[in-house]
Amino acid sequence: MPDTILVAVAWPYANGPFHVGHIAGAYLPADVFARYHRLRGHRTLMVSGSDCHGTPITIAAEREGITPQDVIRRYHPTFLKTFQALGISFDLFTQTYTDNHYRVTTDMFLRLLENGYLYKETMVGSYSETLGRFLPDRFVEGTCPNCGYPRARGDQCDSCGHLHDPQDLIAPRSVLDGAPVTFRETEHFFLDLAKLEPQLRAWIESVDRSYWRANTLLFTQNWLREGLRGRAITRDLEWGVPVPVDDPAFKDKRIYVWFDAVIGYYSASVEWAERTGAPDAWKDWWVCLPDGSAPARSYYFIGKDNIPFHTIIWPAMLIGYGNLALPYDVPANEFLNLEGDKMSTSRNWALWAPEIEDRYQPDAIRYYLIANGPETRDSNWSWADFVQRVNSELVATWGNLANRVLSITHRNFGAVPQPGELTDADRQLIAATQQTFESVTALLDGVKLRAALSEAMALAQTANQYLSEQEPWKLVRHDQERAATVLFVALRTVDTLKVLFCPFLPFSSQRLHELLGYTGTIAPQPHVEETTAPDGLPRLVLTGDYRASAGAWRISVLPPGQPIQPPTPLFQKLDEAIIAEELARLRAKVRL
């Protein structure tokens, strides 16, 4: 029976376009992982969507004098365009502004309330005297009490990741007008994390330390070490999921965004199932089996600033609800810097995805963001390094290997040649191919994407060396049988590398698949469909049918006699002049 895999990906606020840090931090790693499991033939569901209730959206709406829905309709389509351009293959990328999400969130709230894991309590809320209203946490900024960062948000510090309440900040102020905030009492519902703490601790102790990343465990253990306390799940807001209780005091309050956003993984799975015509299919990924075990392995791809929400709060909600599968792994990535400096949207020091997705081949961007990805430590986008690695690794190593082998074969044989007797050199490359296939498989199973990509590229280097030593371009003139054997071995290595690179480089892998004489698709791409939002206006989702790639993860069995198509280069060499051009673009737009 094939494995069942849930790939749950962080929900971005629909208040601005993606920069490359977002892509490297969650969306591209998730896509590589999902594509790999589909190639294995595993039942794979990859879901996410635009977080429509985040405070940044309401801030943008208030500043522009428009509605939150207007902000969402401006930026949600840009997400879909970027995902299509880069081949991010969601089974469903939706929104939290849907009837389905409101229904699932309401059910989660009521079940937790029924099971005794929610309670009411009066708390102190941030209040603007100048505006005469309560302020959401992210409408408040101040100095972080933990690290001293001067622009910490009311709920979390972007610098150190510390979670806190607005009243913990030093000199808190409103982001709307800069005025100091005061604090008033207001009643809200709380998630009883203290009551759930014993079960959470037992779960954390049960996870396999061999695959959870060290930083993910450290963040989680530090939270538990401090002890858990109740966390408010409602706020004095006008925009969001209504609080489903018959209490006039909560008529003008809404469910807090951090609570409803994580439910999105669950609600998106339900929406996907309904869209496929099998409304109960989501249960295959979520509902525990009769023995209490999970029906699937659930992987949550996020940035490190979201670790506590996915290793403490969301698991607590799942435990409190009952009979829903807990995360199997939370591969949280670190941050991607830009030219040695932390990206800053306020300073516009960022490399925005829409700015580069049309200027460079998608596989060049994908390659660099994985090869240089922030898996276990912060990494850095450098234009000089981007050009150097694309040219020396993607073009001169892998692209050159594929082009040389196909060109010589097509010119001299027109098809995959019939091999003769193998030599030790042939057998060594065949063995290296087998070993690399096994090691890349194991690394991808463990979500070690950088290492897996490096192993595949190392095999391409080995195959290039084999070609240089065997010189088939000379052999074709005086020893056709030996030339045929060398090219056959090289073609099968290239064919296997096509598969190994496919999760990382789907566009060029599909092209190579066709050049090698295959029909069909090994790298299906997503597409946009239209549905309807709760306000009756059109709503766009990203989806796709990826079944065509199932079972393609295997060592090459490329048969002799299969026609080879006239090859063209898979990748474009980059002119070094673009380094200065791109750096100039960055400096021209930065705000000091």
Swiss-Prot record:
Protein localization: Cytoplasm
Entry binding sites for Zn(2+): C144, C147, C157, C160
UniProt entry keywords in alphabetical sequence: Aminoacyl-tRNA synthetase, ATP-binding, Cytoplasm, Ligase, Metal-binding, Nucleotide-binding, Protein biosynthesis, Zinc
Catalytic activity, as annotated: tRNA(Met) + L-methionine + ATP = L-methionyl-tRNA(Met) + AMP + diphosphate
EC numbers for this chain: 6.1.1.10
KW Translocase (keyword) present: no
Motif window: 'KMSKS' region: 342-346
Cofactor field: Zn(2+)
Details of cofactor binding: Binds 1 zinc ion per subunit.
One example GO MF annotation: metal ion binding
CDD domains for this protein: Anticodon_Ia_Met, MetRS_core
The protein's assembly and partners: Monomer.
NCBIfam families: metG, PRK00133.1
UniProt similarity note: Belongs to the class-I aminoacyl-tRNA synthetase family. MetG type 1 subfamily.
Protein name in UniProt: Methionine--tRNA ligase
Native source species: Roseiflexus castenholzii (strain DSM 13941 / HLO8)
